[in-house]
């Protein structure tokens, strides 16, 4: 069945013309850039054949250096050598100083409290530093592709908030890049393995990088990834493996001088080399500080086992947050260079009860997924006749009581996307609910565009507000919409794939957005009035039900007062004054409090009738 395409105005793809796009993994420790050539995604190396670019920038009087050269300056020029800047993105200075108290940089606050780093190149913010890393990656891609990039997809952690995501976009703009989309890192890894086509279910992405560990639980449905839960440890990564092994080697070699920075660097380099060797061999030979000896994989495993256990504890918490069991996970994707360690792969496999996916280089997998997505978004996908969109041009939502529109997915949300919201019944014994899908920016149904209607039947007959209906909106990478409604206690479900409809023109979309701004104040007032009328109807219906059941609890005088208050609500609700309705509701609430208390006492006595104190 064809679906409704929700198009972004002003965009058009030219399938016959190949456009240059790249995927960028802007990492905490290292960054990469990848592209699709001849139908295959590949990471792009520098002139020395190195794919990784250390996420390090050194600023000096005559300019700056990025990557390996910058990292070499870290020991002798720590103040001007900025690394792990991703940790600072979108955070206030106070937050950074609390989280990372031992940073060697000279930090000060900007006027709005954001961090500024004092360097030989001047006062710089994290966005500018990130932009310099992105420029280096873009230059690599431009040279390899012999042309300027038409667009990039940049990956970000799934837990990045709006400020951190906006900071990443700002950095790209400073670097002169057109961002097609920010893509969640776990989603990019899943795309690299082709998990976005043909499968549905739960996927875990285990990402153990140099300085951080992230676990993401995703649900894939009809090509849309929904992030169910994220977790991890921002202070745990492969670097910790290296330091543990370096300390072990120091002890074995009898090297007690910890003030010798050169020796510390030598120990760390030896530890890294041994760790890499032990991924393929059972024994690694080490020479450091005039000492030489062997370390076995078993010894290394004993050292790092507690750290690996910590990652699995985070996995367990994430699964609990997602509400799924380990055995429900269809695939486990491994990301990050530290997942090459055999013990990590073994323990993760045991935890999830399946062999993790490791066929793609874990350092490259996120960049490769981003490149695949960039190639699609820029219009190079050969088998796609549909425009692939960056954002939803107009908000999507549902009609609620009173002719109001409840927005579920706001305009300008990047796609693909899945969002869910819970609704409840309005009347006692309600067993069906009409779902009316809307598109637009206004507050009232009459001012928005109707997309579809369907009904959810089989809702349990409960008091008003007793049933909980979860409505999920999904927009896939082609901008196509489907809506599902499910009653949570029974699992009864209904859905709709929105049928083809005449699309809106660019002018119509622009007018809808313009109207939402022009009529904003009027719309808010209309919404407040409608909400108060809905609340008045709910209060009167509840009161009518209570009086029908328990009017005997009231004296004639009390009943008269309540009836008068109810009439006041009816009269106010018939008018157009939201404040008057609100006051009438407040008054009837006051007048019925004693009645509500008596009904509660009666219910408690009935529930306890015939029971002893011990039974209670």
Curated annotation (Swiss-Prot):
Cited CDD domains: ASKHA_NBD_HSP70_HscA
UniProt entry keywords in alphabetical sequence: ATP-binding, Chaperone, Nucleotide-binding
Any Pfam family hit: HSP70
GO biological process: iron-sulfur cluster assembly
Gene Ontology molecular function: any one: ATP-dependent protein folding chaperone
Function: Chaperone involved in the maturation of iron-sulfur cluster-containing proteins. Has a low intrinsic ATPase activity which is markedly stimulated by HscB. Involved in the maturation of IscU.
Similarity-based family: Belongs to the heat shock protein 70 family.
Record's protein name: Chaperone protein HscA
Source organism of the structure: Klebsiella pneumoniae (strain 342)
């Amino acid at each position: 069945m064809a679906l409704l395409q929700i198009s972004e105005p002003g965009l058009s793809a030219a399938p016959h013309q190949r456009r240059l796009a790249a995927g960028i993994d802007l990492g905490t420790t290292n960054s990469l850039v990848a592209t699709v050539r001849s139908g295959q995604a590949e990471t792009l190396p520098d002139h020395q054949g190195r794919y990784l670019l250390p996420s390090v920038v050194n600023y000096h009087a005559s300019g700056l250096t990025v990557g390996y050269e910058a990292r070499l300056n870290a020991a002798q020029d720590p103040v001007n050598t900025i690394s792990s800047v991703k940790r600072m993105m979108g955070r206030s200075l106070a937050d950074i100083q609390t989280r990372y108290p031992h940073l060697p940089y000279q930090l000060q606050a900007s006027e709005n409290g954001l961090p500024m780093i004092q360097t030989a190149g001047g006062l710089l913010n994290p966005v500018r530093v990130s932009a310099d890393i992105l420029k280096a990656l873009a230059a690599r891609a431009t040279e390899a592709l012999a042309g300027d990039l038409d667009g990039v997809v940049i990956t970000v952690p799934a837990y990045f908030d709006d400020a951190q995501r906006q900071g990443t976009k700002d950095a790209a703009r400073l670097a002169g890049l057109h961002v097609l989309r920010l893509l969640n890192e776990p989603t990019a890894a899943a795309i690299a393995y082709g998990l976005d086509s043909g499968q549905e279910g739960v996927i875990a992405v285990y990402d153990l990088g140099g300085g951080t560990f992230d676990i993401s639980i995703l649900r894939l449905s009809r090509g849309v990834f929904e992030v169910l839960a994220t977790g991890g440890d921002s202070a745990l990564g492969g670097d910790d493996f290296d330091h543990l092994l370096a300390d072990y080697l120091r002890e074995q070699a009898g090297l007690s001088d910890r003030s010798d920075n050169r020796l510390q660097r030598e120990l760390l380099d030896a530890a890294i080399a041994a760790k890499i060797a032990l991924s393929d061999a059972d024994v690694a030979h080490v020479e450091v500080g005039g000492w030489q000896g062997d370390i076995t994989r078993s010894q290394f495993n004993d050292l790092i086992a507690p750290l690996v256990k910590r990652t699995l504890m985070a996995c367990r918490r994430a699964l609990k947050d997602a509400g799924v069991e380990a055995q429900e996970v269809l695939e486990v994707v491994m990301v990050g260079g530290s997942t090459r360690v055999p013990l990590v792969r073994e323990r993760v496999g045991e935890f999830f009860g399946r062999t993790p996916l490791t066929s793609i280089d874990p350092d490259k997998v996120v960049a490769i997924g981003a490149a695949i997505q960039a190639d699609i978004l820029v219009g190079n996908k050969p088998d796609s006749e549909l425009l692939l969109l960056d954002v939803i041009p107009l908000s999507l939502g549902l009609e609620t009581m009173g002719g109001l529109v409840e927005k579920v997915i706001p305009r300008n949300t990047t796609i693909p996307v899945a969002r869910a919201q819970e609704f409840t019944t309005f009347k006692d014994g309600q067993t069906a609910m009409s779902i009316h899908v809307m598109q637009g920016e206004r507050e009232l149904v009459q001012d928005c565009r109707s997309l579809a209607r369907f009904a959810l039947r089989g809702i349990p007959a409960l008091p008003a507000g007793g049933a909980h209906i979860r409505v999920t909106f999904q927009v896939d990478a082609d901008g196509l919409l489907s809506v599902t409604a499910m009653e949570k206690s029974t699992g009864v479900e209904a859905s709709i794939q929105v049928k083809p409809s005449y699309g809106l023109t660019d002018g119509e979309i622009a007018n809808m957005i313009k109207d939402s701004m022009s009529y904003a104040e009027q719309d808010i007032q209309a919404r407040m009035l409608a909400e108060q009328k809905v609340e008045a109807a709910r209060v009167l219906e509840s009161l009518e039900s209570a009086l029908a059941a328990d009017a005997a609890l009231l004296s004639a005088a009390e009943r008269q007062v309540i009836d008068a208050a109810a009439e006041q609500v009816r009269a106010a609700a018939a008018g157009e004054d939201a404040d008057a309705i609100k006051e009438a509701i407040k008054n009837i609430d006051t007048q019925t409090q004693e009645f509500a208390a008596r009904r509660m006492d009666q219910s408690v006595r009935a529930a306890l009738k015939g029971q002893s104190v011990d039974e209670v």
